[in-house]
Amino acid sequence: MEAIISFAGIGINYKKLQSKLQHDVGRFLRALTITARALPGQPKHIAIRQETAFTLQGEYIYFPILLRKQFEMFNMVYTAHPVSLRALPCVETEFPLFNYQQEMVDKIHKKLLSPYGRFYLHLNTGLGKTRIAISIIQKLLYPTLVIVPTKAIQIQWIDELKLLLPHLRVAAYNNAACKKKDITSKEYDVIVGIINTLRKKPEPFFEPFGLVVLDEAHELHSPENYKIFWKIQLSRILGLSATPLDRPDGMDKIILHHLGQPQRTVSPTTTFSGYVREIEYQGHPDFVKPVCINEKVSAIATIDKLLQDPSRIQLVVNETKRLYSLHTAEPQKWGTNEPYGIIIFVEFRKLLEIFYQALSEEFKDVQIIVPEVALLCGGVSNTALSQAHSASIILLTYGYGRRGISFKHMTSIIMATPRRNNMEQILGRITRQGSDEKKVRIVVDIKDTLSPLSSQVYDRHRIYKKKGYPIFKCSASYQQPYSSNEVLIWDPYNESCLASTTTPPSPSK
């Protein structure tokens, strides 16, 4: 990208000015060369060709913010180098939006047409960020690049674009597609690319796009990923996130420097009834002891040891069978239920295969007809993703599942391993806008009472209470891996409640 700094005046020492800029500005920029040129009929200009980002205290920040004082000092005006953009075909297509979505579309559209065309949308999981962004694409009619973190989200974007804007030419940009042909904005109207592939592209690849959409923008925090900001300093950038200020490592500020403060809309009125089954599990002494590395408790190693307990694996299988058997014969106050779609979350990949084998054996009779259990993780095939949309049980890692995975038929969660962070996004997997709100949402939370990780449950309680989900406690052990004796420990309608014999809906046996 070429930025032009214009100046006019009498008696300006051009060489001194050039030297001053090189000293004061160049020390912040990763790459900077200043060349003089004269434009016919115009005052002299200084052209700065650079990577459009500078380094300051280890952070990468949108450069005009820092340079503004330099411009004011020399009475300069910053203007972006003009780029000629082709217009997308204009076809009258309409797709329904909720009122809150339409209000946000109007607000984003106005902001993106302003000189500093950046908008950071904060909208809770499942409330239609993708649909809002597609509406913006339709209104602006510029070649658009959508940057996503995973293949699953890429496929969801492409499916949604083809459904809502069928007249546009849409392409997936990944390593496999690029080996077959060169995918550019000349051949396609919207390109949906995975960050790991796009960050390797040179800056000229990005210049023909009139809009960049960053889905799951809070994920662009790693030293490799946020270098993409050096290359996409275009006129219009839209960031999307359900949790823009929720990173425990404090790296949110990196994204805020580029996109500005997140803007959120009024929450919709749709609510989902649900409850939490908190199982206090007393594991075998051989598996609950903390694992220390360098004299500190290692959460990952401790979780790995917890899941070596065969009774704990059986507990998850039993809870899955319990949810799988739920039907409509439940008290009216809990809504109308049908067989549940179940998501099982684990901490890391090798545990997925352990649970997959256990569940596949348990459900082998029904899997003859249709795969009931699906396993999703990084590098998953398109076939596996397609099968997951019809599976009743999906196995995910927390890291993979928190990133915008959309399965509207999923209504319950089993947290097979302890978790503290990203709970808003995890619960959002079963509270997506447009799914059946009549179905009761159920969260099964296993608390390892003898493990040092048991205290994490109180962080999860905070999110459950925010959702208004009653919390029922029950118990199980390595000697008896079947949960029983539910006791209500928190009621949103009676917050002083500490314990009660009230029980949640009982599954059919």
From Swiss-Prot:
User: What are the Helicase ATP-binding domain coordinates in residue numbering?
Assistant: 110-262
Under InterPro entries, the record lists: Helicase/UvrB_N (IPR006935), Helicase_ATP-bd (IPR014001), Helicase_Restrict-Modif_Enz (IPR050742), P-loop_NTPase (IPR027417)
PROSITE patterns xrefs: DEAH_ATP_HELICASE, HELICASE_ATP_BIND_1
Chain sites annotated for binding ATP: L123, N124, T125, G126, L127, G128, K129, T130
Q: What is its EC number?
A: 3.6.4.13
The record's induction entry says:
Expressed in the late phase of the viral replicative cycle.
The reaction(s) annotated as catalysed by this protein in its Swiss-Prot or TrEMBL entry are: ATP + H2O = ADP + phosphate + H(+)
Keywords (A to Z) from UniProt: ATP-binding, Helicase, Hydrolase, Late protein, Nucleotide-binding
Chain location of the short sequence motif DEAH box per the record: 215-218
Q: Which GO terms describe its molecular function?
A: ATP binding; ATP hydrolysis activity; DNA binding; RNA helicase activity
Name the Pfam families on file. ResIII
Superkingdom of this entry's organism?
A: Viruses
What is stated as this protein's family in its record? Belongs to the DEAD box helicase family. DEAH subfamily.
| Name of the protein this chain belongs to | Putative ATP-dependent RNA helicase QP509L
Native species: African swine fever virus (isolate Pig/Kenya/KEN-50/1950) (ASFV)
